[in-house]
């Protein structure tokens, strides 16, 4: 085999120890990279104490983003292929063998694996997710039930459309895509959707297999820690707003477009501005536009919002005519107009240069899109 495990951690040392112990029972000599971005709970010292010649590790005393921590781990991989895991997982038999083979058989593919989960988020559907209660932690994990499931499904290696963060691929693919985006998403959330979209736009196939299997305890990692519990909701909101600042549309819009299952998916980012009479809806509108003509620079809004993003908000209100498309809203914003505004980047490429009225919006397409 020519594939490595990559595990990124931030504190949660006892969880990491259990994950490592279970992984080494199945794969005692497989290459493993553990990347620690700012852990302060003894993780660094524990990593240094391990006598494991097949382990490489990275540690930074500074708190890194989720993306930066995984990117640092990926950099250390010296095999052709790699698979990303979490420390709240149990790896099943045949996991690496099946991924290694399937990646060889399916070039230019980002391949996700199956995660069995307890019914904590049963209503949330995604590729590769199987709801079966085999325990909520390492302390009550039903190993026999898990092994039985793995044995029954180890040969079901057909690929189906769709992928998620629980992914594998050739290291060259991760390099080609520039890794995960640690600039936009601080400290976490949305980096997986962003990566998958960029992979699809680069021509990689997004697939999932049933025959590489893990058990995922869910909500055990640092993103669900006591440290994060009071900040998690705001961080998720900020990351989603930064996703829109980057792409101009929401994750849900990409999903509605069915980007993962299209043979040839395209999405063109262009500069779009809006002219508005007042700042009453600025919080709603700002992430969707590259330039905003308000007639002034709203310093109060910038001061309140800038700490939630690394994007330069003041620049949005400068050189406001430097756009490919300008939208004018002369009436109070209603829900119908807002719905149009949030999906304009999808619909505009079908129109020629010119001016169009849609509801209360005047759309001035100044350049060929």
Language model: regions and residue ranges:
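A short, conserved alpha-helix in the catalytic core of glycosyltransferases
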Residues: 160-178, 184-213
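A recurrent flexible, glycine/aromatic-enriched loop bordering the glycosyltransferase active site
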Residues: 137, 147-172
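Short aromatic/hydrophobic "clamp" motif used to bind/position activated sugar donors
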Residues: 82
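A conserved hydrophobic helix/loop-capping motif in glycosyltransferases and polysaccharide synthases
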Residues: 3-15, 19, 26-27, 35, ...
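Short, acidic, metal-binding catalytic loop of nucleotide-sugar glycosyltransferases
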Residues: 21-30, 287-291
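Glycine-rich, basic loop-to-helix element that forms the pyrophosphate-binding segment
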Residues: 60-77
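A conserved acidic beta->alpha catalytic loop
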Residues: 35-45, 281, 298-301
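Conserved donor NDP-sugar-binding/catalytic core segment of glycosyltransferases
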Residues: 89-134
């Amino acid at each position: 085999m020519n594939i490595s495990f990559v595990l990124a951690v931030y504190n949660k040392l006892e969880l990491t120890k259990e994950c490592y112990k279970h992984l080494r029972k199945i794969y005692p000599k497989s290459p493993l990279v553990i990347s620690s971005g700012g852990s302060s709970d003894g993780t660094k010292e524990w990593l240094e104490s391990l006598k494991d010649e097949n382990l490489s590790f990275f540690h930074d005393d500074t708190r890194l983003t989720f993306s930066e921590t995984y990117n640092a781990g990926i950099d250390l991989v010296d095999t052709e292929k790699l698979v990303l895991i979490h420390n709240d997982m149990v790896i099943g038999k045949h996991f690496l063998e099946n991924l290694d083979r399937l990646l060889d058989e399916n070039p230019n593919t980002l391949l996700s694996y199956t995660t069995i989960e307890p019914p904590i988020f049963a209503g949330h559907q995604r590729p590769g997710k199987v709801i079966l209660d085999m325990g909520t932690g390492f302390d009550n994990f039903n190993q026999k039930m898990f092994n039985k499931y793995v044995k029954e499904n180890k040969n079901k290696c057909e690929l189906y459309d769709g992928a998620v963060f629980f992914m594998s691929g050739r290291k060259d693919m991760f390099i080609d895509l520039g890794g995960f985006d640690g600039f936009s998403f601080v400290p976490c959330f949305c980096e997986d959707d962003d990566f998958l979209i960029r992979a699809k736009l680069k021509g990689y196939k997004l697939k999932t297999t049933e025959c590489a299997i893990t058990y995922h305890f869910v909500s055990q990692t640092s993103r669900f820690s006591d440290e994060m519990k009071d900040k998690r909701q705001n961080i998720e909101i900020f990351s989603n707003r930064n996703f829109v600042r980057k792409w101009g549309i929401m994750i849900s819009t990409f999903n509605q477009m069915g980007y993962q299952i299209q043979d040839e998916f395209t999405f063109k980012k262009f500069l779009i501005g809006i002219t508005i009479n007042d700042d009453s809806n600025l919080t709603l509108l700002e992430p969707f536009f590259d330039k905003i003509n308000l007639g002034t620079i709203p310093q109060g809004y910038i001061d309140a919002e800038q700490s939630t993003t690394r994007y330069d908000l003041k620049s949005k209100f400068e050189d406001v005519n430097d756009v490919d498309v300008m939208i004018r809203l002369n009436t109070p914003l209603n829900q119908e107009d807002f719905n149009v505004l949030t999906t304009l980047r999808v619909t505009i490429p079908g129109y020629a240069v010119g001016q169009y009225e849609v509801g209360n919006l005047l759309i001035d397409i100044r350049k060929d899109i």
